[in-house]
């Protein structure tokens, strides 16, 4: 059984991996584990989630030094991409070109062939939007919210096209419409409702990364 780890930004990403990806990986004889980035060490233990790039860099280098991993993945949002990270200084570019350039910069900085980074367009909540567009979320979100989000997704050209504005990124839209929305509760329930295949069908950037991860 191949061993694959994915360094993730926080608890939402960890829950996405556990909910959508682990069983699919197991079916391909892959042992998959999400690892939340450690941001600090305190007497109470490690703090995890987000933070500056130095935390990612330290942990990525540590994982890449371990020979038992067949693949080391990374899952980090395009929205709020950490300053100091490879490719951060790149100027805005048409369409998704800057995201592709950032991924290329990450691969150049960490040239280990086992390393496969994903810079999520534009946040991990894009997967939730994909599930909502496919019919998920009824009973968990109001019909008004669902209708509003479907219009936004269609106007943008798909859930991964919902942009990275301070008030218009996927998570900000969800929270503005549904103040009680829980990233690791409501969102994960919606994903569980529709399943992985539906999300992959509507999120081609995420799907391409996932299929590459499986085939390595």
Would you name each region that the model predicts?
Residues 1, 14-43, 56-216:
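C-terminal accessory helical subdomains adjacent to catalytic cores in phosphodiester-
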Residues 46-53:
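Non-catalytic terminal and connector segments of soluble metabolic enzymes
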Residues 5-15:
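Catalytic nucleophile-elbow at a beta strand-turn-alpha helix junction centered on a G-D-S/GDSL motif
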